[in-house]
Structure formats: C-alpha cells, structure tokens
C-alpha cells in the first residue's frame, strides 16, 4: 500500500519542473541508440556526455530500445547539440522518461518487500525509505534514477543482515558497475566481507607465520573473488569483445572521474568544503574592507594587504566557487585544495570507521561503519554533489532503529540533508510542495522512529542532554532559513550581485547539521561499545 501511495504521488508530479538532468538522460538514450558501443564514451555531440559506468549505459540502451515508436517520432532519441535538443522533443518524451523512472523504482520496492514483512520495525524502515523526500525531489521532480540504483544497493545491505555474503558482494558489485559513487563505500564492504567470510579467528593462537595463513578460509576467499571479478568482467565484456585498448579504458576512466570539475559543485554540497569556501569569502570581504581604511599601518606589519588585494583581483576572472560554474575553484585567502588532500582526509576518516569493524564484525558495526564511510566521502570528498547525501541517509535509516541514542544524529542528518536538496527545485510552483511534503515526512517518521528506538533501548535511563535540545532548535530553525532564502531569491538584493547568497545560506546552515550529526555518530561508534554488541 505504501508503494502504491508513492506511485500516486509521483504521478501527480510528472508535469512539474525538470532539471538539465532530464536532458542528460535523454541524450544518453540517444547515444546508446544511435551510436555503436565503441563511440559511447567518445561522443561529444552534446555537452551532456556519458559519464556513468557501463551497466548504466546498458540500462539506457535497454530503455532506448523499448521506447515506443510514437515517442521516437516525438524526438526522444534524436542525437543533437544541447542548443537545439529542447526544441525538438515534446511532452510525449517527458511523459515517457518520467514513466521509466517510476517503473525502474520497482527494484527498490522488491529489495525492501521481504525485509519489511519480518517485523513492524522493519516496515517502518522500509516505508520511510520508499517515501523519503530525497527520492521524490531527486527522481520525480529534478529527474534521476536514484530509487532504482539504491534498490540494488539496499539489496546488498539486507543480504549482509541475512548473512548471505556472496549475494551481498554480487549486489554491491552490480551497484558499483551502475554508478561509481558507491566506490566510496567499497572499503567498508571489503573489510566486512574479508573479516566475516574469509577469515576465521576462532581459537586463533599465533605460533609462526603459518598460523596467519591458516586463518584464511581459502575456499571462501576464491568464491568471493570469483563473484566480484566475474561481475566486472561481464560488465566490460562487450568492450573487451570489440577490442577496446588500454587507451580506450583510460577514456572511460576520464569520463567517470573528471578531476577538472573542481573541489566543489556549482551549488556547494553542505560539507566541510562549503564551510572552508565560506570562510574564504568572509576573509576576502574583510581584506577588501581593511584596504579601504586609512589607518592600517600596524596591520601591514602582520598582513600584507596590498599583496592579498592583488591576488584577489587576479582571481576575479577565475571560478571562485560562487559563480555557479563547474570547474577548478580558486581561493583568495586560504590555501588551494588539490584532490590528494581530499582523498587523504576521506581515507583517514574512513579508516577510523573500518578498524572497529575489523575487530568487532557484526551487522550493527557494519551499518555504522557504512554510514561513517558515507559521511567521510560526503564531508571531505572531491567535487561532491548535494545528491550524495542519500549515501549517508539510507544506511543510517537501517541503523537508527537499533538504539535511542542514535536518533538525534539521525534527525540532524536527515532534516539538514533533505533541506539541502531544496535549491534543486527553485521554481515557485515547487516551493510549497517540497516544504509541506518534507515537513510531514519528518513529523511522521521522527515520532515513529522515536517510539520504536525507545523500546529497543536497553541501556540505562537516558537523560535529555543539552545537545538534544540544541539539535531540536536547529531543526526547527530550518524552516526560517528556507523562507529567508526564498525571499533572497525573489528580491535579488544588490541587483543580482548577491545571487549566490541564498545558496550559500542553505549550504552553510545545512553543513552545520550534517557535520554535527557526523560528530555525534562518530562519538557513539568509537566510545559507546555496548551499543554495538
């Protein structure tokens, strides 16, 4: 019934706003339909080039070949420049592509159905995922296929719960071959499957180095390796068959990992780098203000203001992060951040989540580690999209029902994460829809999860700490932030000079919620051992 209700709501949204992601997927349909496979990752007819792994390309190929003739005649599969593409197709194409998103989301329903029937608690988790505002915003208004992809990913999580480790490895490998963003979560799967399925420390006693070899369950290790490797080999089999060379595979990698896109996205995802960028903006404004003062002689001994002003003027034509451009970002005051710094930070914080998992390998630890790996990649990764917050929200949903202490970080994450998606829907007709639906979802599921987690809490009596009250104040203040941002968008203060101000407000305020929730979960994960037994 929940899924049927969700379909009804989605059908009401088919005529709503759609983003350029609609053009992206329409162009991918055209590429896979009109061109031979060897040209898929080389075509530049349209700026919306194919930049997803091969399995998703095959998915687009499948959709293009089941497209009805009347939709093809509408221009759905015409390969053309982005300058004229929107003038060629009509509403028939829009309806068809909307329908494919709704239909593909059946995978999400299938992955959750059997799990939801096991208990009322599981049903609560599954229904909250199916009705999550993030999927409604990203897939059924903005336009993407996240529900379908997360259905595959969730299947791997549920397989871990059922101790079907080979199935989990298979489903995660398939997910990775559909969308490479799941690569951020691969370390958690690697450590867990290695420890739970391939290593046996029962009655282990180190005598010689032979003892270390004996803890390896070689049969399981080979089976696991066979499942993972065969998935990737089958995925790339068509490219192998047509004789792709090393240079051709490098072309695919360059499409999947375009480092030239810069540290931050056009709209800053609410992570550490949005705070970093904001501080750089504030320092830039401060330096400009100090430069106008007459009495700054003493300051010149500490700060070389003329040199900073010269640097700021030099960067005026560059992408300073607030121009809505997708390219390398240049900071005026703070040090520049290369990709290796983001990778090092991501790896460091993921390692902190992986070590406890290796020594205490169970489902609770796995979900906790998976969530923290998602946090690490989202907060410190390179060119993170705001949509990637779902990589953290979905695993955390399986975790929060296990204990009351996890509720506050979860509410902080989901509320700030969902609100951070609001700028994707900037038209007036979507303003009330996104607010009312998200607000209703938060009220219903925050209250329900609170009741369930209270029953599952087996520790000592829990006090309501100041942090919890502060978190509630933060969540309530999200609504004024949304309204203020709406006013800024309407009036465009400063004749458009501060057009990025509302996005900066969203990004900075939501980053506080995401960052605080990460700290809260990290503390519980590393220092509250009874919670993970």
Language-model region placement:
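Alpha-helical transmembrane segments
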Residues: 1-10, 105, 126, 475-482, ...
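Start-transfer (signal-anchor) and selected internal transmembrane alpha helices
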Residues: 1-15, 114-123, 518, 523
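General structural concept
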Residues: 2-68, 154-161, 165-171, 204-213
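Membrane-interfacial catalytic/cofactor-binding modules of polytopic membrane enzymes
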Residues: 22-27, 31-70, 77-98, 133-149, ...
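Hydrophobic alpha-helical transmembrane segments in multi-pass integral membrane proteins
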Residues: 60, 97-108, 112
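Membrane-embedded helix bundles of polyisoprenyl
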Residues: 86, 103, 121-158, 165-186, ...
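Hydrophobic transmembrane alpha-helices
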Residues: 109, 113, 117, 153-162, ...
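Histidine/cysteine- and/or acidic
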Residues: 161-265
